[in-house]
């Protein structure tokens, strides 16, 4: 039975995620016992908003072909497609075929666009991404293989229609060996699949909705992946020196290893000790800088800001559906601006900036605290996108009105936790919230 192209790309991004997804699919199909069912992290599933935007992006190109270029476009997106139906449409010699669903011995998938040029074929894949990624090229390799197998025609060119609404030609030559090796690994992996033996999840893989399952394995194995911000290549260097767990790193007598700076190695040893000593209710930490990097004392007029958004709804920035402002005054006042669409988002952004500017008239020395650099990056992208308050925002940044508390925490503390999220750091201050904070 052929494999879906989307699952092949999932395997490229993470063999562990692919194994989990395959296992759940087999359980749902009642081909293996229900005891193998794996819980997913629903918050990591692709949002409906993103799927809608992706579909709209495809329609933009379809309308460009159909209306702007006056091409004959056959739409197979809503048809019961098969190789036979597709070949029948191809015989009619249209200019473009939209979303045919075709299969070869190894793979099955729905291509975005097949363009007929003389006796040759072009493949165009629509992506919301702002740049070409290797996974896009791997996907085009599979599409080309399927299409050439089914039609016996040559695919001479492949393109990506990216978020900038431009065509980007893809060159395959330097990726041929990568694709061949990846396909072999994929086929071998499926031939030896065992629901009892998952591949080990590696740091840096796109674990998607199976990230919690990966964390369970890391915790069970006391894996080095639990160390804060450690990279896969650093884990390999430690394993090459017979250091395979957090406890082994904590107890090693080594003071340095090849390929890793001495300062970095010592930092990870200290983090391993703190992590090993931490419990669910009490997190161990060490103060590196007692001044907390010059953190100012809180004063009247200081504000605390936080945003929530959907990724990739608009190219280059998030759709910010919530701007929040909390004031540490006697009323603990909280102001928020909610948006259901991009027009409302602009109004919310304008209201948010105007609120800050008005606040500074009352409290000229006020600081606006946030956690991580996300808020500043988001504000800059929104100001540029909406064409409002760009100058005023830059002035606020230059005057250092915004204070990133994460920078202070990261430079001042070593924490025995896998994450320096706000939810984690709050525990150090004895704060326990009921809300499930994401940052």
Regions found by a protein language model. Name each.
Residues 208-327, 333-334:
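C-terminal extensions
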Residues 171-237:
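Long, highly charged, low-complexity intrinsically disordered interaction regions
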Residues 20-21, 111, 134, 227, ...:
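Short helix/loop capping segments that flank catalytic or ligand/cofactor-binding pockets
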Residues 1-116:
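Metal-dependent nuclease catalytic cores that hydrolyze phosphodiester bonds in DNA/RNA
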Residues 54, 58, 179-182, 242-243:
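Short amphipathic alpha-helical coiled-coil/interface segments
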Residues 22-23, 74, 198-203, 283-288, ...:
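Short coil/turn segments at secondary-structure boundaries
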Residues 78-80, 89, 93-104, 108-190, ...:
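Conserved DEDDh/DEDDy metal-dependent 3′-5′ exonuclease domain
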Residues 67, 243, 254, 388, ...:
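Short aromatic/hydrophobic-glycine micro-motifs
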